[in-house]
Design a protein with these regions (language model features):
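Hydrophobic h-region of N-terminal signal peptides that target proteins for export
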Residues: 9-18
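Short, non-ligating residues that shape and space the ligands of small metal-coordination modules
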Residues: 99-100, 251-252
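Flexible coil segments in periplasmic/lumen-exposed cytochrome c-class electron-transfer proteins
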Residues: 19-88, 92, 128-241, 276-309
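Extended intrinsically disordered, low-complexity coil regions enriched in Ser, Thr, Gly, Ala
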Residues: 108-134, 260-272, 276-284
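Cys/His/Pro-rich metal-binding microdomains
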Residues: 91, 108, 243, 257-260
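Cys/His-rich metal-chelating microdomains
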Residues: 96, 248
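Sec-dependent signal peptide recognition
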Residues: 2-8
Length: 309
């Protein structure tokens, strides 16, 4: 299968848009101002194991995302498959499988009540999304939210993120298409440093929204063990053991969401939101004490460990 994004070598310095101080750009994905030239694949696109085919334009349609494996997800409500008015189709960012990408959230298997409550927080402004969820939530009806929540709650989670400890990663950029981080064509490698870099395991399949092709999260060496200590024990009083509320396996308890196997960028964004007050929902009262003493390195380590589970 040809790659949908066929890049030509680029010898241009990429300039990131300004980031809010204290928020790491590896977690808060902002498209680079300069983008590499791309040539979209012409004709029908296929992915392994699926009888379906789509054009590049259909794959990128935010009002009708591809359903590569309809038997795995069942019939989706209209709000998930097509959106409504200014409301994008939920499946365009979260995928019809619910697994999402680095810039969105993995909703598969979360409780419907939790999703409904989260959408209410976006609607009211109690939870501020750095991108688009507040604007999406406001015009949605209670019935649309309920249907979307029940759909994503019915999906099977797991097996989406592979974590690898390393010192070196490919040079990357954040695409304007979907705000995905992708390898910079011809860019070589660079030190990872104090970052987590998430990339599709297969670029062509990832940019085609293939729900069977997940992500690899490159994390600093030693970060998973450090995160394990913080998550399991609270790090000698620095924080509170996550399993108390999220379950020993981090798969969630009741309406408390799972954090196991989530995109580390997403987990980090939520911890920063609790720290900075951009999430001042009811649940933030519990999380404030959890995040109060966490450093940037702690948040990175927790995100790395949670993703590895």
């Amino acid at each position: 299968m040809l790659m949908r994004f066929m890049f030509v070598a680029l010898a241009t310095t990429f300039v990131l848009q300004a980031q809010t101080p204290g928020r790491p750009d590896w977690a808060f994905l902002v498209p680079d101002k300069q983008q590499p030239p791309t040539a979209e694949e012409s004709g029908p696109i296929h992915i392994p194991g699926s009888a379906k085919e789509y054009t590049a334009a259909q794959i990128d349609d935010l009002a009708n995302p591809p359903v590569w494996f309809p038997d795995e997800v069942g019939a989706a409500p209209s709000i998930v498959q097509h959106g409504k008015g200014a409301v994008l189709a939920c499946g365009s960012c979260h995928l019809m499988s619910g697994h999402g990408h680095q810039e969105s959230a993995d909703l598969a298997g979360l409780s419907a009540d939790y999703i409904v409550r989260t959408m209410a927080d976006f609607k009211s402004g109690a939870r501020i999304d750095p991108a688009r969820m507040n604007a999406i939530a406001k015009p949605m009806s209670d019935e649309d939210i309920k249907q979307a929540a029940e759909y994503f709650a019915s999906l099977k989670p797991g097996g989406w993120i592979k974590v690898e400890e390393t010192d070196t990663v490919p040079k990357t950029y954040v695409s304007v298409k979907g705000r995905q981080r992708l390898p910079l064509p011809g860019g070589g490698t660079e030190p990872l440093g104090d970052r987590i870099i998430e990339l599709p395991q297969d670029i062509a399949r990832g940019t085609s929204r293939d729900p069977h092709s997940g992500f690899i999260a490159y994390v600093p060496k030693g970060s998973v063990a450090k995160g394990a200590a913080l998550v399991k024990t609270g790090g000698s009083g620095k924080t509170i053991a996550c399993g108390i509320c999220h379950g020993d396996s981090l798969e969630g308890l009741g309406d408390v969401p799972r954090i196991a196997g989530l995109h580390p960028a997403y987990v980090a964004r939520q911890l920063y939101a609790f720290q900075t007050g951009t999430n001042h929902s009811v649940s933030s009262a519990l999380m404030k004490k959890v995040v109060a003493n966490l450093t940037a390195d702690d948040i990175l380590a927790i995100a790395a460990y949670a993703a590895s589970q």
